[in-house]
Amino acid sequence: MLEIMIVTHGKLSEGLKDAAEVIVGTSSHIETMCLESGEDIQTFGEKVKEKLTMINTAEPVLVFVDLISASPYNQALLAVNELTEEKKAATYVIGGVNLPMLLEAINHQMLHTPIEEAVEQIVKQGKDNLTVWHASAEEKNLDEDDF
């Protein structure tokens, strides 16, 4: 089964996991890592490496991070690069995590989707769920409905 690890600044990873569990129920295959304010980056990196090594079984692993090129992302990449070649090949780091992406990952986890296909769909879901709404758009639609 696809393993999921969420690595973020603050408690965001725990919040994302909690929100997902409200929607789809609990999962024993989602791990979280929180970079706390003032925490030593090297120490955090060691924790990420330990947890990633612990969960990285023969199954593929998705590591979600909140910001690319930030500390959680960099530490995740460093940890992945220390895995065996086989485990490294089965691990993907995805930046810019949001709740739709996590839900999509959980769906693919349950469906046992091949990792390459799952990653493609997860990233698409994350992008497709970005939108902007403003009241002026509603007013315009109301005006157009009059005709």
Locate predicted features.
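N-terminal loops that bind phosphate or other acidic moieties
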Residues: 2-147
